Amino acid sequence: MKNEQPMTGRESLELISAMIVDTRRRYHFEDGRLHLFWGYLDIAVALLVWGVAYFTQSVWANLLWWLIPVVGIPVSRLLSRKSGSKGYALSYTDRMISSMWRYVGFLSFAFALICLLFSFGGHPQVWMLMFFYSFLVVGMGTAVVGLLLDYRSMLYGGGFSILAGAFVLTATIAESPLLEVWAMPLFIASQAAMFVIPGHLIYADTRRRAENKTAGDA
């Protein structure tokens, strides 16, 4: 039995490029829709929380944030099941990105559980922690995916979210009145930057590729 020849530097780069292209193709099949779904869901729930909190002046309005995982997880699974990416073998890049988002999801439940426990202890204001999670953790995850797949819209969107999170965190520490004015608008803007804008760009690129393929087959 012959020993396998080690890969050259060029072959390694070609393999990595092929995995990235293959993962990008899967993003064009399903993640355009998933990005749009999560982005618009987050924005809708944020507006709902904002409105309820404004009219009731109650911090318990933050419990409405649970609508995001309660609605989002089953619907996103349904969208993934219906996606056209079935039948493709998962590459290392796919598994790495999937594992990263699972870890991000685990952190969201861990953070939410901490907030819930402190809320029952009479400190409902701790739900602000979920803002920092969304800005910083999700922003970092989005930026990493943008770097891995060379999606500049996701890289810039994640970067915007991280910077917005740094502003909100600083305003919280400084007890600045800017927090009440800018926290929710920045959250909504960050969701649009991370999910809605990249989702529309990916969806438009998918349609353009499909039209070019149809024209080429004709």
Regions found by a protein language model. Give the residues of each.
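Structural signature of hydrophobic alpha-helical transmembrane segments
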Residues: 62-71, 122-136, 185-189
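N-terminal juxtamembrane cytosolic/stromal segments of multi-pass membrane proteins
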Residues: 1-32
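Helix-coil boundary and interhelical linker segments in multi-pass alpha-helical membrane proteins
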Residues: 50-61, 115-128, 171-182
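C-terminal ends of transmembrane helices
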Residues: 22, 76-94, 140-149, 196-203
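Membrane-proximal helix-loop-helix units in multi-pass membrane proteins
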Residues: 100-158
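Selected alpha-helical membrane-embedding segments in polytopic membrane proteins
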Residues: 28-114
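Terminal transmembrane helical module of multi-pass membrane proteins
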Residues: 142-218
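Membrane-embedded alpha-helical transmembrane segments of multi-pass integral membrane proteins
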Residues: 41-48, 71-75, 114, 138-141, ...
